[in-house]
C-alpha cells in the first residue's frame, strides 16, 4: 500500500488502540482471547489498531510471534480498520529486514518504528535510522517518539526533517503539548500528528492534531469518540467536561508500569488477557484494587 493510500485511510482513524497481547498461564499467546476483545474495541469506536507495540509487550515477543499476531488480527478485522505493525527495534539492520518481511504480507497499512533505545544515538543517527527503515520497502512508517521509555528523544526539528521523506507519514508523539503544537503547526499538510499520551488526547485534537494512539481506548473508546465529536463541533467546554471526567481513569491506567493496569482491568471485565511476560509483572492485589475502584468510580 502506498503512502498516499495509507494517509487517506488514517485520516479516518482518530482513535487507534495499541492492542494488548493476551497470554495463557504458561506464557504462550492466547489467540482465543482476541476475537471478543477486537470486536468489542471496534464496536466502541476503535478506528485503527497497533499490533506488537509497547502495550503488546513487544520487547518480549519474537518476530515469529508478531507475525502470528498480525495474521490473526488481520483475519478478524478483515479490512474494517487500518492495521499498524510494530516493526522497530534499536538495531537498524533488524528493523529494515523485519519491515521488508511485514511489507510482503500485503495487509499491513503502516509500520510503527520506535526511537532506538539504549544505544543513545545522535539526532543524525536517529535520522539515518528512520530513513533506512522508510526506504527499505513500500510500507509507510509512523515515527514513535517516547523518550520516557527509551531515553533518547526525536527532537521536533528532526521529526520535521524526517517528515520530508515520502514514506514517513505520521508521528506518535509522547512528549509535551508544546511539541505537539509546534509539530502540528509546521509539518507538511498530509503528515499526521497523533499523541501517544492518553491524557493529552483532548489537547492534541484541539490543537489540530489527528487524534490519539491509545491504551485507555481499550475501555474508554466511547468517551474519546464523544470528546472528539464535541471538539469537531466546536463545543470545547463540553469536550473539556469529558476530559476532566476520564482523566482520573487514565491516570489510574498508568499508575503502575503499562500494560499491567489495563490488563488488570480487562481481566476484571472478563477478557482473558492473562498476565505479563517478565521482566514485567502483574499489579499487586492492592494496586489492582485501587485501579479497579478508580475505573469503576
From Swiss-Prot:
Record's keyword terms, sorted: Amino-acid biosynthesis, Cytoplasm, Diaminopimelate biosynthesis, Lyase, Lysine biosynthesis, Schiff base
Subunit composition and interactions: Homotetramer; dimer of dimers.
InterPro entries: Aldolase_TIM, DapA, DapA-like, Schiff_base-form_aldolases_AS
Protein residues bound to pyruvate: 55, 213
GO CC field: cytosol
Protein name: 4-hydroxy-tetrahydrodipicolinate synthase
Organism: Lactococcus lactis subsp. cremoris (strain MG1363)
Gene Ontology biological-process annotations: diaminopimelate biosynthetic process; lysine biosynthetic process via diaminopimelate
GO terms for MF: 4-hydroxy-tetrahydrodipicolinate synthase activity
Cellular localisation: Cytoplasm
Function text: Catalyzes the condensation of (S)-aspartate-beta-semialdehyde [(S)-ASA] and pyruvate to 4-hydroxy-tetrahydrodipicolinate (HTPA).
SUPFAM superfamilies for this protein: Aldolase
Chain segments annotated as transmembrane: none
Pathway the protein takes part in: Amino-acid biosynthesis; L-lysine biosynthesis via DAP pathway; (S)-tetrahydrodipicolinate from L-aspartate: step 3/4
Reaction(s) the record says it catalyses: L-aspartate 4-semialdehyde + pyruvate = (2S,4S)-4-hydroxy-2,3,4,5-tetrahydrodipicolinate + H2O + H(+)
Signal peptide positions on this chain: none
Main location: cytoplasm
PANTHER family in the record: 4-HYDROXY-2-OXOGLUTARATE ALDOLASE, MITOCHONDRIAL (PTHR12128:SF66), DIHYDRODIPICOLINATE SYNTHASE (PTHR12128)
